Amino acid sequence: LCIQEATAWLSAHEPRFSQALQKTGPLPLRLRPDGFERLLSAIVSQQISVAAADAIWNRMKAAGFTNPKIILSASEEKLRSAGLSRQKSKYAKALSEADIDYEGLRTLSSEDIIKTLTRVSGIGVWTAEIYVMFSLGRADVFASGDLALQESARVLFALPERPKEKELRVMSQDWSPWRAVAARLLWAYYNYVKSREGIR
């Protein structure tokens, strides 16, 4: 994944991306490790603050609950004592039972990876897309259900209202084969606008 090549291509194909880059500056290439822990962490982080997610994750690590075998042998009460809700305890067990071949995933198409991951209870399309983008470094994936991306696109493209998931997915086709970098740029632009002008 070459950020410089991608941003040059996007700027040449869409002048508004060039304008956004002038505001955001160069985009960092932030990749995270792939594997079981990354997906488990994504489940833990769903619908709670970063601080709360970090606190729960640290308790889980201390208890050994980042290992699928230990999670499977633990009672729901033990998992809940580490801070997981009843629902997330079930999701953690479902992910542990899924026995995903994480090395094998790397060889699949992005579409097939997303299909594989979303078969697991607790992993939706957004979580799978973020995993493919940030843990596997795929260049042509776009999380069109992400509210920040939708709002950033509304502001950057001067749209009358925030585009819905399907509308943004259609828009993003024009940014292929660098849709993941377009997403990174839109997130950076969202943060820029939010910090300077206020964003609803």
Question: Where do the PLM segments sit?
Answer:
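C-terminal accessory module of base-excision DNA glycosylases/AP lyases that mediates lesion recognition
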Residues: 1-27, 106-111, 125-200
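A positional/architectural concept
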Residues: 9-42, 47-62
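Non-catalytic interaction surface on structured domains
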Residues: 10-12, 23, 31, 35, ...
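Alpha-helical ds-nucleic-acid-binding substructure associated with the helix-hairpin-helix region
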Residues: 16, 48-49, 53-121, 174
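Structural motif
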Residues: 29-38, 83-86, 172-180
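A general alpha-helix detector
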Residues: 38-43, 74-78, 112-116, 148-152, ...
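Short alpha-helical scaffolding segments that buttress acidic/His motifs in well-ordered protein cores
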Residues: 39-44, 92-96, 131, 182-186
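Short amphipathic alpha-helical interaction patches enriched in hydrophobic/aromatic residues
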Residues: 43, 75, 79, 99-100, ...
